[in-house]
Amino acid sequence: MSLVVNQIVGNSYSCENFNETKQDPIEILPDELVLEVFSHLNLATLGTICCVNKAWKRLANEPILWKIAIYREIAFGNDKWAQCFGPDVVKDEDNSEEFSSLPSDDFIADCKKFKSIFPERNAKDSLMLVRLSKTLNGGLTLKSLGELAKNYFSASDTGYEFICAPIIQEQGDKSINKSQWVLMTKDVLPGSRNKSYGEQQKIVADLAEKSLISYEVPETLESATCILSQYFGSNIRLFSDSPRTYTRCKDKVQGYQVVVGGFAPAGLCVIYRNYDRDNIGVAALRKF
């Protein structure tokens, strides 16, 4: 004996027992109800149910479902900033605009492109999607970001394991023009280590020309925010000290490119260097 739900007037339903062949619940329930259920699934499950049949695939392929799952599972957005530091840290942000502007389709497309270029890498685990909130902690800067980092690295006066004094003096109070989403690689690009900055710029430019359109060398504040966000949310030290890894940034201080990384248990390093080494490569970042 099986239970079947038949839709009647409005949003009310009646139930009846019968001995006939079981019906697919997708064919019985209204699309709105199925989509509500599917909205609680993770990315892996959404991908799996697309293979059940055409009806399931039609509903599971709704862009809003993937957007919700990516926001919840992949993105480090205002909700995660608030979870880590309290709601006041993003109290002046527009959360509706934040979600509507989430580049979920671009994230999926770039993951596929990244996989085609670097087949040895897991694409989903190679890109981080981070919200750079202009008003974060009163205004996103290297200094205010460091104040947040002190919650995790209390032994540091700045929130960083080390940040060069001239960087604080020249860039410490600089912010961003607007709140925005960015995609950044979780590691330096293959083949970018121990190269001059000019060579690293060309590596990123060639990548952008081939497939990953609009990717560029990251700036110091962007790099530090993205790298620290992954630690705040998941306790993961990207661009770490094992093996020691830095990304070069666009910014110059005292004539030298800033590098960010060497993320040790004591915190992140933001320094500047005038030489090429195997531990200095370059990441790639895309703004939205």
Language model segments and positions:
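Skp1-binding F-box subdomain of Cullin-RING ligase substrate receptors
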Residues: 4-74
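A binding-site-centric feature that preferentially detects glycan-recognition modules on secreted/surface proteins
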Residues: 71-216, 221-288
